[in-house]
Amino acid sequence: MKLKLIFKTIYADKDKTDLFYCVSKGIIYNKIKNKIVYQLKYTEIPRYFNFNLEFESYQSNKIYQSNTNTYKNTIIGSIYNLVLYIDIHNLFCDRFRINNKVLKILCYYLIIIQIRQLKTNKSYNITKENLPFKINDIINNPIQLIPWNLFLLGKNITLDLKNIKLVTNKQIPKKKFQKTGCIFESNNIDKLTHELRKKITTKSLIIIPTGFPKLWTNCSSITYTTYIDLVQLNDNFENKFKNKKMIHNIIVHECYIQYIPIIKKLIQYFVDCKSIWIINSLPLKYYISNDNNTEGKFTIGNVFKLANIWANFSTNDKKSYKTEIIRFIMADFNKLYFKINFPTDDLPVQIISPNILELNIFNEFRKFHMDWLSKLNNDKNNIYSSTSKHKNNRIKSKIYDCVMVLSLSVINNNDITIFFKNKIQKTLDINCKISKKIEKMIDVYISARKTSHHKINEKTPVDFTKIVNSLTQKKDKINSVISNYNRYQKNGFYDSIKDNDCPVCYDDDYIKTKLICGHTVCLTCVLNILPNSKGCPLCMEPININKMAIIRESIGESNNYSEMLDLLFKNLSNETLILTNLEETHNIMLYRGFNVWLLKCSFIAKKINFLSKITTVIILSSPLNSINDSDKLDFEMFQEYIKLVNPNISIKRIQLNIY
C-alpha cells in the first residue's frame, strides 16, 4: 500500500515547456528551454518512497481577440504535480531495522509538505445534498489535535519528524475538542435552517441578536441583550432555564467575536451540551470587528477565539498546544467552517439613461480603453500584449465608477470650497500621521547610528546616514503636501483663481472643472491628462477623480445636461440605504450625506436595528456583465440578510446604461 502526497505543483507555459523527470538525478528538466526547473535535495529510495511527475490539468483563460472584439477560451499552460509516493507496507515491516538516513530524508520531505499545506487555499464549500452527511460526520468525529512533529502515514503508522523515528498510532498523544459542531455560512439562512431542522431539532437553545427573526420552532431562545441584562441585574438565570440538563445543542446566529465570552458561559451552565452550531449569514470577516465599528484584524488569535468555543482549552493548554493550534487554523480550519449557498432571485433593475455629459465622460475614458484593446496582438513572447476577460471587466468597472463619481461631482460654483473641505481635511490627516511615523523612524535610526559600534565597510553595508537622508527626503515631500493643502483650506482660496480661457487648449467656451489645487481646466483636457500625467497641468499637484468638481453653471443648455441621476438620489428619504462596491462612488455619496454603505465594511451586519427602520435598499454596483464573482456573492448574501432582518423591505438595483 502506498500513500500519495502532492509534494510540489509546477505551472508550465504553453509551447515553452516540455517537462521530464529524471529519476536518477532527482531533477525536473525543461527540454525546450534546456533548463532545470526543479531539483530534489535527495534522490528517491524506491523501497520506501519515490517521486513521479503527473499531469494535473490545463490552464485556460478567456483572452480578448482584437480582430473580432470577442473572447476566446485559450489554453495558456499546464499544471503538473510532483507526487511523493510512500510505501507504508515496507515502512511498517522494516520499522525496527530501517536505516536512520532514510527516515531523515523522509522527514525532510514531509516537513516541506506540511509547510506548503499551510499556504494552500482550502475549499470550504459544501452542497445541500452533502449537508446531512457532513453533520453526521461532525457529530461522530470530534476534531483532535496531534503534536506538530507527528505525520500520519496511515491507520497504523506515524513518522515522528522531530525524533526521526516510526511510531504506531496507538502511541500518539491526542488532544480532542470537547464539543462537536461547526460554523455554517450561507447566503440564505432561512433555507439553511430548514435543512438543519431535519438533523438538529430537539433539546436545543437558540441564541439570536435583538431584532432577528425566530426561525426555530419548539426550541428555547434568548437574545444576546437579554442574557447580558440577566447577568448585569444579577437576575436568577436558573428561573429562565430551570431544566438545564434538557439542552444538548446550542445554536448561535450571527456570532460576533465580542459575544464569545457570553456563549462560553452558557456552555458552562448547560453541562450536558454536546454540540455548538454557529450560523452566519455573511463571511467571517464581517464578524471580527472592533466596538467602534471599525474593521478588526483577521488574525490567528481572533480565529482561535472562535475555535476555542469547541476546544475549550485552558490557558495552559493554549500554551502547550500553541504550534498545533496555529497549524490547525492554517491547514485544517475547513474541518470547522463550511459554506453552503442556495440559488437567489434576480433583483429588479432600474436602468437610467446617461445624459450628454455622462456620455461624453464615458466616451473619453472608453477612447483610451478601446485604443489599448485594438493594439493587443496576443504575442506569445510578450505578456503585455494580451488581456483576460477578468482583467478587462475590472477596467470596465473602474470606468463605470469614474463616470458615476464625476456625474455626482457637478457642483454650484459657490459650493466649491465646501465641496473640497472634507477631502482636504482627510488628506491632511493621513499625511500628518505618515509624517509622524517617519519622524519616529528617523529618531530610531539616528539613535542606532549613535549607539552602534560597527564601522561601515563592505562586510557591514548598513549605512544609517543614507537611510536617515532617504527618510528625511520623504518627510520633506509629505510636509510639502501638508503645506499646500493647508493653503487650499483657506477661505476664499478658490475664488482667487481666475477662470479665464482653458490654460491647456485656450478654449473660451468649455465645461469648467475645478481641481483641488484651485486651477480651472476644461473637462476634456482633464480627462485626457488623467491617463498619462495624473497631475495638474499648471502646478503638477497630484489629482484624480476625487480631487475635481465640475462647475454646474458652465455646462449650459447646449450640452442638454439632465440631472436624472442626481435628482434620483437627492429625493431619497432617510429610510433609504444605498449599498455599493464602488469605492470612489461611495466616498462622493458619503460626502453628500447619503445613507451609503461600502460592501467591504465589516460593521454592516451589526446594525440590525438600523435595518429594521429602512424601507428601501438600492444596490449600486459595477455593471452586471463586469462584476466579479466575489462581490456578486457578497451582494447576494447581504440581499438575503437584509430581507431576513426586514421582510417588508424593498430592494432594487440601479444601473447607469453605458455598458
From Swiss-Prot:
Span of zinc fingers (RING-type): 502-540
Domain of life: Viruses
GO molecular function: zinc ion binding
Matching PROSITE patterns: ZF_RING_1 (PS00518), ZF_RING_2 (PS50089)
Keyword line: Metal-binding, Zinc, Zinc-finger
Signal sequence, start to end: none
SMART domains (alphabetical): RING
Stated name of the protein: Putative RING finger protein R311
